[in-house]
Every structure is written in C-alpha cells, then in structure tokens.
Amino acid sequence: MKILNDPIYGFITIRYPIILNLIDHPYFQRLNRIKQLGLSYLVYPGAHHTRFHHAIGAMHLMQNAIDVLKLKEIEISEEEELGALIAILLHDIGHGPFSHALEHTLVKGVSHEDISILLMNKLNEEFEGKLDLSIEIFRNNYKKKFLHQLVSS
C-alpha cells in the first residue's frame, strides 16, 4: 500500500502493487508531460493539470464509487475492483501532445482510445495477462456494464 498526495483530492491510497508498477511504467509516466487542458494554460496560467494528475484522480474517484457500491451490497469482486481501477487509470494513456487539440491532426482516423487499447495490450503482454479484465471493462465487453460506464463517464 502507498499513499500519494494529490493536488485536488489530497491523500490517495494505492491498495494494489500492480497499480504502482503501472504508474511507474514509462508509458504512464509520459502522461506527466501531456496537459489535460490542452492549450488552455496559454490563456489561464493556473491551468497546469496533466493527464497524469487526471488519471490518478479518476482512479481515486473510481475507488470511492466502488466502495460506495459495495456498501450498498452491489457484488464486486476484488478482481473486478482491480480491473476497473486499472481500466480507468489507463483510460487516457493513448493521448498525444496537447491532448484533444491535436488528436485528429497527428494521425487521421485514429482516436486516443484506439491508441490507449494498443498500449494497454502491450502492457498486458509485459504484465503477463494481468490486464485482461481491465481491457474487457475498457472495451465494454465485460458482463457488468456499469463498470465500463464508470470508466467512460
């Protein structure tokens, strides 16, 4: 278990070692250099939120949502919880420079979601298949559709 200090949500507890390994991976670390708000920082000097910060915050909110659903006696296994957390952590891993501002300019007909899937598949190989469920949830191929809805909303 590790605790991160997030500028928006404060202390965020990371419960699973694989999530720490994914955060430390170069594919994820590159999100530190990609602005969440595209070119907005040129107009709003305080708009320096990165895709890295966004992904960590989104994962934190997913954990909160899962905790509440479990309190309401919605059945979510530990494997499903981890799968959803990884899916949302990596949901924007395919973003390129300046986020959405240049998305369709750099590679026509390919969205950041398409690139995210490619990178998730590559990470799945490196992590010996441990991202299978996360990819199913991300692609909306898992039986509990609400997990994908949490990722995509």
What are these regions (language model features)?
Residues M1-K35, L42-L85, G94, F98-S153:
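Sequence-structural signature of the catalytic-core scaffold of metal-dependent phosphohydrolases
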